[in-house]
A protein has these predicted regions:
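A broadly structural signal marking compact, well-ordered functional cores
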Residues: 24, 225-361
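Intrinsically disordered, low-complexity segments enriched in polar/charged residues with Gly/Pro
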Residues: 74-77, 144-148, 253-256, 319-322
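C-terminal motif of bacterial Sec signal peptides marking the signal peptidase cleavage site
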Residues: 18-20
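Positively charged n-region of N-terminal signal peptides that target proteins for export
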Residues: 1-12
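Surface-exposed, charged secondary-structure patches
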Residues: 67-137, 246-312
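Short beta-strand edge/turn micro-motifs at domain boundaries
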Residues: 120-135, 141-193, 300-307, 314, ...
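Core segments of small alpha/beta cavity-forming domains
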Residues: 22-82, 86, 181-257, 264-265
């Protein structure tokens, strides 16, 4: 009976003894998790990237291209792999819940890649947002491996829980830890997202102003599409004060059609030193139709307001149907807080852009 009791006791204790001998501790699990983050599937950084894109995306209308996400995850993993971590012994907080201190020196990605990104943004390699981001992330991934810049040493406590025979790290703790270790990790996207979002804004501004295509402009300006369309109609199509009422509707329709014939292409912005400052080349084929219509109208002699009104509207309709253009030209437009705040003032940079696209009579 005693021998049987001893055997039974050994049978019961054996799993516990084996756990103590070969089982994993909470701090070992934390260390292996860090190694997996450095060497395993980069998709482990997906939640961190998604959170960063959501926060940065609140400032942009354009969205992160899907093709950019995988290289961005590899960039984050390369940055994380450059950091040395010291895992201290775990302390038990409560039953099967442990605190594991991790000491490390975070990489400062704003300092590591920021200057190189701004230099690239001053002369972007492509007019395409995706192509530029792919090139930038390739260069930045090399930078974090070759010349990383670090911040001040810090310690993060990870909460590690044991369930049955496995451990897990609290997801909130893990994401906070990754964000702390990768300070400024959205620097590439913030730099170039702002650049190409500005290109999209200026294009949408011109499309709304000249063509009445307001959907994208509404997004950029926090308007509804109806509000943006009212902005488009305001003042622009007011007829001359002495135009006969019978010709007002035709005048407005002719003007809208004439403006829609305007031709321009907004180039890739170039970042300038300072906050929110860009230079943008706009390639324009001047729409001379309005000036030519008025010139033709002014050659005639009219003996009544109705006769003059009919002639003016007829000239506008003629050139709206068969527009005339000048020689292609490129205008460099500075875009910053000052130029945007003075856009509706005569002689401003934005007003000059408008009159280059559609010369006044």
């Amino acid at each position: 009976m005693r021998k049987l009791s001893v055997l039974l006791l050994c049978t019961l204790l054996c799993p516990v003894l084996l756990w103590g001998c070969t089982g994993q501790s909470a701090d070992e699990y934390a260390g292996e998790t860090i190694t997996d983050l450095k060497e395993g599937d980069p998709s482990a950084f997906s939640r961190l990237l998604d959170a960063g894109l959501e926060e940065s995306g609140a400032d942009f209308v354009i969205q992160c291209p899907e093709e950019v996400k995988e290289p961005y995850l590899k960039f984050l993993q390369a940055a994380f792999a450059s950091i040395e971590f010291e895992v201290a012994s775990a302390s038990e907080r409560s039953d099967d819940v442990y605190s594991v201190p991790i000491t490390y020196t975070p990489i400062d990605l704003a300092q590591t890649v920021g200057a190189a990104n701004e230099e690239t943004a001053a002369d972007p390699p492509s007019a395409d947002f995706t192509e530029t981001m792919l090139a930038v992330l390739e260069a930045d991934t090399k930078l974090v491996a070759d010349d990383p810049v670090y911040g001040a040493e810090t310690t993060t406590d990870l909460t590690v829980s044991r369930t049955d025979d496995s451990f897990s790290i609290a997801e909130e703790d893990l994401q906070s830890f990754l964000a702390s270790a990768l300070s400024g990790y959205m620097t590439p996207y913030d730099t170039f997202g702002a650049l190409y979002d500005m290109q999209d804004f200026l294009t949408s501004y011109l499309d709304a102003s000249f063509k009445g295509e307001v959907a994208q402009f509404a997004l950029h300006t926090d308007r509804t599409e109806d509000e943006a369309y009212e902005w488009y109609l305001a003042d622009t199509f007011d007829p001359p004060a002495d135009l006969s009422q019978a010709y007002v509707a035709r005048y407005q329709a002719a003007m809208q059609n004439l403006l829609k014939q305007s031709s321009y292409t907004v180039g890739t912005p170039r970042l300038e030193p300072g906050l929110f400052s860009y230079q943008i080349d706009v390639t324009i084929t001047p729409n001379n139709s309005l000036a030519d219509a008025y010139h033709e109208f002014e050659q005639g002699t009219y003996y009544s307001i109705d006769e003059a009104s009919e002639a003016l509207v007829a000239a506008l309709e003629k050139y709206a149907a068969a527009p005339t253009y000048g020689a292609e030209t490129t205008l460099t437009v500075p875009v910053n807080m000052e130029t945007l705040s003075t856009a509706d003032q005569e002689g401003s940079d934005m007003a000059t852009l408008a009159t280059t696209i559609l010369p006044s009579p």
